[in-house]
Amino acid sequence: VNVDIDLAWILEVARRAGQGDPAIDDYGVAVAAVERHRAVLVGQDVYQGVYAKAAALAHSLGRMRWLERSNLRVAVAVAHAYLIASGAPAKLDQRRVSALATELRKESCTAAGVAEVLRSWAV
């Protein structure tokens, strides 16, 4: 099940994951993440499937600085919450969190690379 999330949803996940920490520096990044996961080109979803959509969200939120300090933590939390809301299996532990954070820190990071990491979260 693909879940269509909005800005309020991302901000709520950010509030919870950032433990009240994230001061938002750029709302435009979160708005762009929402629109990116919904992207359609010639009648086809640009990001097909829940892992690709979660990856588009995490890539946008984790690669572009939009919060004062909690960008990676929130990107991980948004990806996980999106997968769970979509009914996809997604087991989270320190190893999996670290793998996603490592991927997001790479200069060569792509949404496809993030999706590959997220697929490894399947239980």
What is each model feature region?
Residues V1-V123:
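FIC/Doc superfamily catalytic core
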